[in-house]
Amino acid sequence: QLRLLIKEQPDIEKLKLLKETIINEATEVTLVISSNNNNLIAFSYFECISDNVIGVESYNYTENILKTIEGISIFRNLRSIVIDALYDNKLCIDELVSLEKLEELCMSFYPITKYQYPTLNKLNRLKRLKIKGLDSNMLSCLPNLETLTCFNLKDGTHLGIKAPNLRSIDIYRSPKILNLNFLLDLKELRSIGLDGLSNVEEMPDLSNLHSLTGMSLANMKRLQS
């Protein structure tokens, strides 16, 4: 595997040279984009290696928030997308629907919006999801989802139906969650992590989750022992 750190607009001729000398058909490439303004780095620059790109990571800690991921569908073998730090809270993710191999999506800086759920609900191959503000009432079925990391979970009531094969769940800073009975419906769970669920007062009996092997609790200030 090859990780390419992109800090400025790439030189297309140098990318072609890289393709000729280092990158072969079997080389898997992850683009790690971290510039002063990631909006200036168009995905079309990477057309010559587009079939090799299996991961895109966008890191942005300047005032230039990421406004678009237009053109990302050029990477037809893309399996993982990480969008970290500042991005437009109305970021259009519609193009992800055409990425038939996408297994991982990380977008947890801003809460997911009602405009983004229709796309999320079509990502049937998704195995790993890291997100903020998830409401299970807005989900349709994500049958292949195995790992869920959620900040500020709004409602988990229907996760057992919507993500029946979930094996690992981590929930952080979620004061809207008052009870954890929905965990009982996640029959395949092997790992549970709870941190900052400040209004949960008691844990349900998890003894029927026969696959559960690990659990961590932190900052559960109202939880009664």
Q: For the regions a protein language model found, what residue spans apply to each?
A:
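Concave beta-strand-loop units of leucine-rich repeat
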Residues: 2-95, 101-140, 144-178, 182-225
